[in-house]
Design a protein with these regions (language model features):
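Structural motif marking the loop-to-transmembrane transition
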Residues: 3-4, 145
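Beta-strand/loop substructures that line and gate deep hydrophobic ligand-binding cavities in soluble
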Residues: 106-162, 168-170
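Hydrophobic ligand-binding cavity/cleft-lining segments
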Residues: 4-74
Length: 174
């Protein structure tokens, strides 16, 4: 009888979590900015040329021995950075579009779970030879687990974007 109560409580908890997930956001949006003491073109080149990516991105810094591969022409649509590691999983970042002030990437995660996101970068002249860099990312949070984990995803990405922009700032200003 006790086992039946425990099983009933577990089923009830699952039903409650599924119900809560119905009302949670089905996507996320992150935006962080930083001022870098270098001209706009210089900073934009360090983001749009993925040969520099491992030097400043916060995920690569966590697993420096991970495998990576860069294909395509720098600063051109189709330019791609792929990675594979035990800690950072596997995926790719592909330049989708670029203009004078923006760089847009498609982000695809393969491991530990499949997901897609969009990365957008805005570069604005700011003061004397300074650049305001804005990094945006948005993606879907699938029902139910993605939605239930949405708060943690958002919180972790906020921290990682701050770390990434600080790394980019140090890399550009050295």
């Amino acid at each position: 009888m006790t086992l039946l109560y425990i099983l009933g409580a577990i089923v009830m908890l699952i039903v409650i979590l599924l119900f809560i997930a119905l009302f949670l956001p089905n996507g996320y949006f992150i935006e962080k900015s930083a001022i870098i003491k270098k001209p706009c073109n210089f900073v934009m080149d360090r983001v749009a040329d993925l040969h520099y990516y491992a030097q400043w991105n916060p995920w690569q810094q966590k697993e420096k021995n991970s495998e990576s591969n860069i294909t395509g022409l720098p600063k051109r649509p189709g330019h791609r950075y792929s990675w594979k590691g035990k800690k950072i999983g596997a995926g790719s970042l592909t330049l989708r579009d670029i203009d004078e002030k923006h760089v847009h990437f498609d982000l695809e995660f393969i491991k530990p779970w499949k997901a897609r996101a969009r990365d957008n970068w805005l570069f604005e002249e700011w003061g004397n030879d300074e650049t305001k860099v804005t990094w945006q990312d948005f993606g879907a949070l699938p029902y139910p687990m993605g939605r239930l984990m949405g708060y943690m995803v958002h919180k972790n990405l906020q921290r990682q974007f701050t770390e990434g922009l600080n790394n980019l700032k140090r890399f550009c200003e050295m």
